[in-house]
Amino acid sequence: MRSPLARPGASPRAPDLRDVEALVRERGLSLGLPLHVEAEAGSTNDLAKSAARDGAPHGSVWLAESQTAGRGRQGRVWSSPRGENLLFSVLLRPGGAMPLARLPELSLVVGLAVRDAAAKAVGDAAGRLRVKWPNDVVALEGDALAGATDGARPRWRKLAGVLLESQITGSGARAKVDALIVGVGLNVHTRSFPGELGSTATSLALLRAAGAPAEELSRAAVLVDVLEGLHRDVAFVAERGLGLVHARLTAADALRGQRVLAEGPTACPTAYPSACPTWEGTCEGIDLEGKLLVRGDDGVLRRVSSGEVHLGSSGSR
C-alpha cells in the first residue's frame, strides 16, 4: 500500500535516474533496493519512517524529485528545484542491537560517504570538499582552500545536508537502534539559488573541475556512489566504531584548526547552559566517538556531542 505521505503515482524516471537499480546490482551493494521514486513527497524521511514501522527491509531507498516538507537539522527547511538534485532517504537496520552511543559516529560516516561521492563526481583533486561536523558537506573557497594564514575565517558554500532519525527499541540502558533513517539533500544540477542561498550554497554542476569526466553529471551514479560508501563503512562502524575511517574523516574535517563558536547545552563549559549561550575556542578535530574537540579560550579541551558549531558572525555557518 502506498504511504499516505506520498502523492499518488510514482514519478516517471528521469533519464539520469534510470540506471540506479542496474548499478546497485552491478556493484553487489546491500543498499539501494527496493528503490521507490516519487514525483513529489512531503519528506522522504517520513516515507522511510512509515515504511520502517511496517517492516520495510534494510537498504530500501526513497527518492523524490520534489519535496513539500523537506527538512534538515534543527528543523531547518531544505528546498530544491524539481528534478535537479538528489533528495533521498535510506533505511538502515544495523542489526546486532546497535547501541545509541554509535549514532554520532554513524552520522559522520554518512557525511563522509556523501563527500566522497561528490568529490568523485567533480574531480576534486585539491580536496576542497569537506565534512562540517556533524555531517554537512561544504566546499571551501578561495584562500580557505589555499590555507590562508592572515587570520581571516575560511569561506565555504554548502553542498549537501544530512538528517538522521532513528527508531529505538527498549529504554534506558537497554535502548537499542532498530532502524536508522538517513536523509540526504545533495545539490547536483542547480546553477542558480534564490535569495541568501545565492551566497551560501553550491552544487556539483557549479563545482565541476576542468579535469572531471567529460560525460554529463548522472544523479544515478552519484546516488550509487553514496550508497557504496555507506555499504562499505556503516556495518563496520555500527559494530566497532570509527577506528578504520577516522583518518579519512580527519583529512576531510572542515573545522579542524579553526576558531569556532559553539552553541547548545552540551557545548557549554559551565554547569548552567542558560548562563552560557555561546562560547569560543579552537577546534582540534573529531574524536573516536564522533565528538568535536574544542579547546576553549580558558585552555580546557571539551568534547562537543550536540548543539550548533560554526565560525561566528563573520564566517560561514
What are these regions (language model features)?
Residues 279-286:
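Short beta-strand-centered aromatic/proline hotspots
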Residues 171-208:
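Short, acidic (Asp/Glu-rich) active-site segment that either coordinates a divalent metal cofactor
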Residues 44, 88, 114, 136, ...:
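Residue-level signal for inorganic ion chemistry
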Residues 167-168, 191, 286-292:
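Short, conserved beta-turn/loop elements at beta-strand boundaries and strand-helix junctions
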Residues 209-279, 315-317:
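Conserved, helical-rich catalytic subdomain that frames metal- and/or nucleotide-binding sites
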Residues 1-123, 142-161, 270-271, 314-317:
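N-terminal lobe of the biotin/lipoate ligase/transferase fold
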Residues 289-291, 297-317:
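Structured surface patches comprising rigid loops and adjacent beta-strands/short helices at the edges
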Residues 141, 163-170:
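Short, low-complexity Ser/Thr-rich regulatory SLiMs
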